[in-house]
């Protein structure tokens, strides 16, 4: 799977074996700003400050 791994939408990388999810972390406030992106084996848990969304198709994050 290929996932974006920077805040720039045109940069991505091929994920290592076993990491079959892409994630995007978004700050919940003040403006729902994208915080980080990358590959993961399991979806990171959201917190009070950051909401994580995961997907399993190329460049979906």
Curated annotation (Swiss-Prot):
Keyword set, alphabetical order: Disulfide bond, Membrane, Secreted, Target cell membrane, Target membrane, Toxin
List, in alphabetical order, the Gene Ontology terms for molecular function in this entry. toxin activity
Known InterPro entries for this protein?
Cytotoxin_Cobra (IPR003572), Snake_3FTx (IPR003571), Snake_toxin-like_sf (IPR045860), Snake_toxin_con_site (IPR018354), Toxin_cobra-type (IPR054131)
One GO cellular component this record assigns the protein to is:
extracellular region
Tissue specificity is:
Expressed by the venom gland.
Localization recorded for this chain is: Secreted; Target cell membrane
Family designation: Belongs to the three-finger toxin family. Short-chain subfamily. Orphan group XV sub-subfamily.
Q: What miscellaneous comment appears in this entry?
A: These two sequences have Gly and Leu at positions 25 and 27, respectively, instead of 2 Met that are found in most cytotoxins. The low toxicity of these 2 proteins may possibly be correlated with these changes.
**Name of the protein in its database record:** Cytotoxin homolog 2
